[in-house]
Amino acid sequence: MTATEAEAEAALEPQPQPQPQSQSQSQSQSQAVPDPGDAAFDLAERFGTPLFVYDFDAIEARVRSLQAVLPPVVDLAFALKANPALAVVHWLGRLGLGADVASGGELATALRAGIAPARIVLTGPGTRDDELRLAVSGGIRAITIESPSALDRLERIVAVDGRREPVPILLRASTAAAPWRRDDGGGLAIDDGSGKFGMDPDDLRMCARLATASSHLDLLGLHAFGWSNVLDADVLADHVETTVDAAIELARMLGTPLRLVDGGGGLGIPYGPTEPTLDLARFGERLRGIVAGWADGPLTRDTRLLLEPGRYLVGPAGRYLARVVDTKTLAGRPTIVLDGGIHHLLRPTLVGHEHGLWLRRRRSVDDGRFHDRRDPRPTTVAGPLCTGLDVLGRDVPLPAASPGDLVEIGDVGAYGFTESMPLFLSHPMPAEVAVRDGCAELIRPGLDPESWLEVQRIPSW
């Protein structure tokens, strides 16, 4: 059920911070965050470590910079898979974005965050019947169909539901062999030819004809997406152009205009100093050229282009704080062991992204300096897990560390905590904090392993 605006605001009220074994008690009201030197320590002492911190001002700045270059025909839907934190989704909704959800849980999150159903699209393969029913009853903007069998299931669900209004849908095209795919775009393959995403042309055309003839379904348009974290504006624009061309061809075949073209996401951010920054101005220029004349063809002046950015908006706005619990020298190399690791931040190990990593110390009372950078040495930064995979950084140039220091890791606002494995080895789960206008608020408390034990049962036999 859709939360009212008041309910959404209430859901974001700060809560008292529990006291898990490795986290300190938090205050519930907003407080100013000092800047620059001791900010990390003040956050760590107030909310405990490990800790995820999201800069809402940075999120807003990235949203505004993207909106500024896009043609008016473009709508933005935040991809919740990047960061489904309720407060983050709510903030992006206040900034004018809709939501791209890929599960019933993400749909519930978007609704609770106050996103209007008319601005939500459900995408993703393997959508269950209960998720389809939730989307139908919620009256969302569109449900993406990825196979003929999914179309048939949705048709039956709508028929049983007895709705008078047809349910809006998008058809997803496979991009495994798309001509815009290039190996030099700096992205990660989503649709890699595995047969999981979208439909081949024959199945897509068949589904289009069936949907057009159905009294239960309303074919809005076409969806295609196959590449993530692209850093080349022309690669992104080529994909959108190919998707628009495919929508025009489909509309001509059906003899009816399409009202929505969904180009997916894929806007990337650089991980590490050697990666380029996405040229937003170039991307916007290409998009304006692509949509300039489509109202003269089988698309109409009312046709919208939907993009689903996620990582680009929130990735650089997040940082992860963990405390140094031990130091040692192994084979002549300094090693730092933290109270957090890949159970909270798996992506650096999973895909090899090079996140910025810094050692933070309290400002020295004696000399007034913060974070003495003299004599850095290649250092291994590891977590507390009993696996050799739990390494967050290798050969990181850092000065000598001491227990109690902090390590800060940047660019973790997307695909951070929720993509990791927080239950492995039963360590406490980190809290999440939002910072805006110099004030920090708890948006999700840390969770103690005891909470996981409370929902488990020992069988009677």
Kindly label every feature range from the protein language model:
Residues 59, 81, 103, 135, ...:
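Conserved, mostly hydrophobic/aromatic
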Residues 126-127, 148-150, 159, 174-178, ...:
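Short acidic/polar capping segments at secondary-structure boundaries
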Residues 1-167, 214, 218, 435-461:
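A charged N-terminal "starter" segment
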